[in-house]
Amino acid sequence: MNQTKSRDIPLYIYHAGQCDPKKCTGRKMARFELARLYDRISRLPRSAILLDPMAEKALSPADDPKKGIIVLDCSWEEVERVFPELEKLNLEHRALPYMLAGNPVNFGRPFKLNSAEAFAAALYILGYKEQAEKVMSKFNWGHSFLELNREPLEEYSTAKNSTEIVEIQSHYI
């Protein structure tokens, strides 16, 4: 697989406005024009990849991210409310494999990634490593996430499909 891809993948955030604006990674990404914020589900692009922790299929390099990647930046209660609306959008639901958070709030906790970390992980796995590094470069703790997860991210990025991702993940859990 290529070390990096030439064009950046569009990144989208459904932002419910429920977080501390000073700590919100989604808002910061939007300020740096790394992602677009949406406050309505109906405005999200169709056919994109939705990073969904409850998805049956793991994100893998076999997925086509050209239509973009979507992250939900909201509470779990809000997720339950919006999921019926999300079903109408024809999105590709994908779960991220095992990784540790590098952010100060959840440092070292498995699966507790914030929006920026979720995007960086997805981009890295899909082969867009430079874009992943660009996202993380905007946060003073961003290097921690990439360093903590360098080995699994490299392995995940070599997988052929979702099944291989799950196999690789089993070595880290």
Swiss-Prot record:
One of its GO terms (molecular function) is 18S rRNA aminocarboxypropyltransferase activity. Its main location: cytoplasm. Keywords: Cytoplasm, Ribosome biogenesis, rRNA processing, S-adenosyl-L-methionine, Transferase. Pfam families: Fer4_RLI, Ribo_biogen_C. InterPro entries: RNaseL-inhib-like_metal-bd_dom, Tsr3-like, Tsr3_C. It comes from the Archaea. S-adenosyl-L-methionine binds at T25, L72, L96, S115. It is found in: Cytoplasm. The keyword Transferase applies. It catalyses: an N(1)-methylpseudouridine in rRNA + S-adenosyl-L-methionine = N(1)-methyl-N(3)-[(3S)-3-amino-3-carboxypropyl]pseudouridine in rRNA + S-methyl-5'-thioadenosine + H(+). Aminocarboxypropyltransferase that catalyzes the aminocarboxypropyl transfer on pseudouridine corresponding to position 914 in M.jannaschii 16S rRNA. It constitutes the last step in biosynthesis of the hypermodified N1-methyl-N3-(3-amino-3-carboxypropyl) pseudouridine (m1acp3-Psi). This is 16S rRNA aminocarboxypropyltransferase. It comes from Methanosarcina mazei (strain ATCC BAA-159 / DSM 3647 / Goe1 / Go1 / JCM 11833 / OCM 88).
